Each structure stands twice: as C-alpha cells, then as structure tokens.
Amino acid sequence: MPYVHVELFEGRTVEQKAIIAKEITESISKHAGAPTSAIHVIFNDLPEGMLYQGGEMKKKK
C-alpha cells in the first residue's frame, strides 16, 4: 500500500493536483505492480518561508 507524499509551494489548483496524483498513481502501478486502488497520494502545501536549501529560503518561482 504505497503512500506518496508530495510537497509543493501552495498555489496549485485542485485540478492540477488531480492530474499530478493520477500520473504518479499510474507510474507506481506500472513500475511497482501495485493496484491503483492501493496507492495514496498526499499533498502538503508549503507557504513561502517554510522551505530552505543550503540555509537559504527557497522562493516560489
């Protein structure tokens, strides 16, 4: 039962997330042999200021 956590800067629409979730689900099913009904995709929306790389704040592009 795969769980995939996707962390993105906030601002994606529900429709965009649905497309991303569908493609992730299809890829895992194809390459790992898991049934699509067992694959969970969880989105975490990150507000700006919550992600740092190399000590520097990452900004939305």
UniProtKB/Swiss-Prot annotation:
Belongs to the 4-oxalocrotonate tautomerase family. InterPro entries: 4-OT-like_dom (IPR004370), Tautomerase/MIF_sf (IPR014347). The active site is at residue 2. GO terms for molecular function: isomerase activity. This is Probable tautomerase LL0574. Keywords: Isomerase. It comes from Lactococcus lactis subsp. lactis (strain IL1403) (Streptococcus lactis). Its EC number is 5.3.2.-. Coiled coil: none annotated. NCBIfam families: PRK02220.1.
